[in-house]
């Protein structure tokens, strides 16, 4: 057999394997092969700690969070983003010089204890580029050194300022940031602050107690989040407050008065059951709501390099630009 024939055979075999794996991924999980690969990657890279180690790690988290957050250098954002100090909080503003009266306030996730990951920044960079709107990314106060009350105070002030200067404002948040975004909007009802034109929630953490009995059915397929670890971080954020306080668990808050809510949630994450409850609560409250169910998707699938994330990004852009 000639060398070129061997190479051709290897290439064809490789393509056949890829095709078979793609078909299997579609049949078994109803998702792309890349999404299945990402889930495997997450299983091996996302650590689930012993609860004792989580508590011991608080001191390290405080040291990290006390340092000034630095945007990932490989995303080359230095000329595109302005960094400002907003009432003692680090704030990044994308498209600051653009002549637009539309703005996005994005509240990142991280279990209320971690700073934004590379994927967060890459995602908001895409949003800023594709919309051309001003995009605000606050590095809000984190547990265990700070609690939800401090974050609510500074974020409410920031939102009110953004709201007063723009005709259209879109509030977005992922995971813990999604729960915080929803809780903020519920507090706006009480404080008579104008609602965002659209509230966009990506896999929001909306009940920090994680006491929903149905969650246990999703533990085996969840590659990222540990129920026990996440509960500890949530209690640190609560700092002694009742866990059913809507500012911590907006699933229990008043939804009557919210304007328009969009929920993106994967079916292979422990937060899925609570988000289905939230969707039904919003329907019962006569709130305009749309549920984007990511079949076979993992936590905050929107930020990963998979075909489903590209579809979800287009859906987000359609919401914002309609």
Regions found by a protein language model. Give the residues of each.
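A glycine/proline-hinged amphipathic helix-loop "lid/cap" segment
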Residues: 2-96
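Alpha/beta-hydrolase superfamily serine-hydrolase fold, recognizing
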Residues: 16, 24, 28, 82, ...
